[in-house]
Amino acid sequence: MSAAFQPPLMMMQRPLGSSTAFSIDSLIGNPPQPSPGHFVYTGYPMFMPYRPVVLPPPPPPPPSLSQATLQSTLSSAHHHHPIPSLPGGFCSSLAQGMALTSTLMATLPGGFSASTQHQEAARKFGAQSLHGAFEKSDGSQSDGEEGNKTYITKEGTLLPFSASEASLGPVRGQGKEESGKEAEGKGKEDSYLMDSDLDYSSDDNISCQTAHKEEDTPEESPQNSNPSNNSNTSSTGKNRRRRTAFTSEQLLELEKEFHCKKYLSLTERSQIAHVLKLSEVQVKIWFQNRRAKWKRVKAGNTNSKTGEPSRNPKIVVPIPVHVNRFAIRSQHQQLEQARP
């Protein structure tokens, strides 16, 4: 019975060859060409770069004898630490490199007995370098790049990309909600400014709340406290502010106040708005329009918008055609000469 079990025991003692002399070269075998994605074992106990370097995904390694023998060693002597078949990227190359170094140190007799410490150091280094690389590349990655990406957590376990994205989801959701609130606040301020601070020196903004409309308007509810509600869509598709229908009593009071004072203070505006049951914005816009019309009347150009002749034109005396202009000039010259 002992003779039957002796060849497997011999194979367990010397799994990598039949040579009696032990060396690192016999462990490694014929080393393959170093692929650009893997860590290359250089004979040191640990290959630790100072900065986390994001390496390109490794090509499929050639099926060589050394890797097959390494995996056989791994399955026979080191069951609790298999090489994870990761889908590629920086994490897979990092994990494979760490697994290779840990298995090599575990199979070396004597000198490297504390392989568990190196495994813990490898796990910690993998987690730290991974978190650093993730913080650097998080700004450049878009949300649409959801591939089969895995991450190593602090405990050494592999976390899929979707789980880490779900953990980051509430933070990003709060940021989106805050940006949405800011955008809504800016939109309200812009609409308020567009309604209140128009260019009242031009004629296009003069609405029906001008002074000289003494005819009675249909009494609609003039209480439009929100200036954002004053905008509706006309048939042409343009957003246009709805004109406020003032009553004759409101127009009369506004005219009286305007003749007394062209510019109102904030307290006066609030008092007038409270008495006339209007909003302060409506009183402000009415006074701005009224001042613009008053300045145009003062300048002598009332209806320049429609192209009609003004109501108070400058008096121009035309010269009749049948009058000889030379005779008029000669008469003026004679009169000037007759003066002393």
Swiss-Prot record:
GO CC aspect terms: nucleoplasm; nucleus
Biased composition (Low complexity): 65-76, 220-236
InterPro entries linked to this entry: GBX-1/2, HD, HD_metazoa, Homeobox_CS, Homeodomain-like_sf
Record Gene3D superfamilies: Homeodomain-like (1.10.10.60)
DNA-binding region as annotated in the record: 239-298
GO biological process: regulation of nervous system development; regulation of transcription by RNA polymerase II
Keyword Transmembrane: no
GO molecular function, one term: DNA-binding transcription factor activity, RNA polymerase II-specific
Subcellular location: Nucleus
Biased composition (Basic and acidic residues): 174-191
SS bond list: none
Keyword annotations: DNA-binding, Homeobox, Nucleus, Transcription, Transcription regulation
Keyword DNA-binding assigned: yes
Region ranges (Disordered): 58-81, 154-196, 211-243
Pfam families xrefs: Homeodomain
Function: May act as a transcription factor for cell pluripotency and differentiation in the embryo.
Protein name, UniProt field: Homeobox protein GBX-2
Annotated source species: Xenopus laevis (African clawed frog)
Organism lineage: Eukaryota, Metazoa, Chordata, Craniata, Vertebrata
